Amino acid sequence: MEELQRYLKMDRSRERDFLYPLLFQEYIYALAHDFGLTKSIPYESMQILSYDNKYSSLIVKRLIIRMYQQKHLIILDNDSNQKNFLGHNKNLYSQMISEGFAVIVEIPFALRLVSSYQGKEIEKSINLRSIHSTFPFLEDKFVHLNHVLDILIPYPIHLELLVQNLRCWIQDASFLHLLRFFLYEYHNWNSLTTQKTKQNPLFFKENRRFFLFLYNFHVYESESIFLFLRKKSYHLRSTSSIAFLDRTHFYGKIEHFQVVFRNYFHTILWLFKDPFMHYFRYQGKSIMSSKGTPLLMKKWKYYLVNLWECHFYFWSQPDRIHINQLSNHFLDFLGYLSSVRPNPSVVRNQMLENAFIIDIAINKLDTIVPIIPLIGSLAKAKFCNLSGQPVSKPAWTDSPDSDIIDRFGRICRNVSHYYSGSSKKKTLYRIKYILRLSCARTLARKHKSTVRSFLKRLGSEFLEEFLIEEEQVLSFILPKISSSSQRLSKERVWYFDIIRINDLMDLS
């Protein structure tokens, strides 16, 4: 127990005080605003995905003045039908405060991260931030495993648990009290804690950064215990099993059970010890894979449920964890459908006068694009209908033609960029077709013309924004095979500059 306490307190030695005054600094809200607009290449800005950009320094100054006047109840009023001062909706001020909170609470953790990199080569760890860095790991490890636990991570049953966890890292009582007040008065919290949707409610787009940080920190606390137990599994489980064995000898009344347990003692220990266990997480989903038996996976399943409910007060249910076999199950993770498929090959072996033909089946990770959910995401963004028929984008008709083409072309390139690791890239042709024809319909609507006449007038130059895609990038990365376009289209490439999933590709 003392070792466990030292493990938990190891990373908490750098607590930060006096975070509350930062909430009244204008540059904090500027940082929060810039965070949403300066993402990596695959992430579109808020304007591209039709989110309103309402940030201004004048609004921030008025918000800070109102906070100095201690009129928080007015700012966080639940009545969304009324307008706050100068015609701005109160929801805007609530969202700005949450963005400021998100920047401030990240400061202690950012300082701890910087200090951990002191004296180390940070450049080598940057690539590990990419979402695509997970898939090379899956290609190396998953092909040798048998079963997988598909886990929907639960969320805390009460928001006070989030504040209590932060008390271990932040000692500014004023900031924590204001944080608690904000959580209780925040008008969207009831919708964030409901279970009416299958999606984890803490990942809704509105004020996502703030609640996502609180949720990830809560999960981090539970995972720290889990990883500690995993690292110490050999010692802890062996000790526990030996104690149980001594107890059976002490009672000594069930002779048959004594003999069976003694003979299969090493087998029982193997059921608990699994050196081929792998675990990774993204958003509200985690994957645990193993080479062990289904019995071992069931033990891990109920162990996680009891750990969440009894020690961390997560609202968890066993049906949120599914045990599947990798050979006949598609893993829905990070926008891909991944599965392990045997790749048969024939090897001819010549030994003197005898020749042998050997059939070999090597497991291979198969990653495909979930075309139906992706079309549904495009339909939600008003690029097509639910059946995949392209439609125009009326909201963009006020923009210049070059901006419209640039927006559609950027989204098309980003989709190709993210799904460059797909095993079957032909499924992307339909997505590109939807975006190209939606762009043509938008331009034709703007100029009050038909799509056919508009395309005839522009000719092939119209498609240049869409055609400069993966082929040219791959020919630069893989010059040796650039002459073979057929082989080039089958190559899977994972990029290390993707740190966030585009909203169109976030199918969770």
Swiss-Prot record:
Where is the protein found, in the record's own terms?
A: Plastid, Chloroplast
Decide whether keyword Plastid is in the record: yes
- Provide an example Pfam family for this protein: Intron_maturas2
- GO BP of this protein: mRNA processing; RNA splicing; tRNA processing
Q: Which UniProt keywords apply?
A: Chloroplast, mRNA processing, Plastid, RNA-binding, tRNA processing
Main subcellular location of this protein, as a coarse class: plastid
Keyword ATP-binding carried by entry: no
Q: Name one GO cellular component term.
A: chloroplast
Q: Which GO terms describe its molecular function?
A: RNA binding
Kindly give the PANTHER family that the UniProt entry links to this protein: MATURASE K
The UniProt family comment states: Belongs to the intron maturase 2 family. MatK subfamily.
| Role according to the record | Usually encoded in the trnK tRNA gene intron. Probably assists in splicing its own and other chloroplast group II introns.
Identify this protein by name.
Maturase K
Q: Which organism is it from?
A: Ranunculus glacialis
The organism's lineage?
Eukaryota, Viridiplantae, Streptophyta, Embryophyta, Tracheophyta
> By which gene is this protein encoded?
matK
